[in-house]
Amino acid sequence: MTIIASIITLSNPKQSTTGSVSTVSAAFKFGSNSVSCGGSSGSGSGLLGGNKGLLGLLGGLGGSPNSKVGVNIGGGMGPQTGSMMGGGQPNYCGCN
């Protein structure tokens, strides 16, 4: 997990000002998203996938844009996702 975290951190160095509050350890926060809060607005990357994320093609955990609650698993299709299963839907709260 540490290696994956390092790769994602290097690939997504920018931190988001939205969706950054997390009840879990800061070690689980990568790029512009946190595990508990999903993602940032716009084209921010999701955790292990997400909106145009590093592992978007593999799906998995992906933060949705403007998400405030929960972890978005998988996600929908469309320009917001970056892939069929990677990432989530805009303004989505909860577990998708």
UniProtKB/Swiss-Prot annotation:
Highest taxon in the source lineage: Eukaryota
Database matches in Pfam families: Coiled
GO annotation, biological process: sorocarp development
InterPro entries: HssA/B-like_chaperone, HssA/B-related
Positions in coiled-coil regions: none
Family the entry assigns: Belongs to the hssA/B family.
Protein name: HssA/B-like protein 25
Organism listed in the record: Dictyostelium discoideum (Social amoeba)
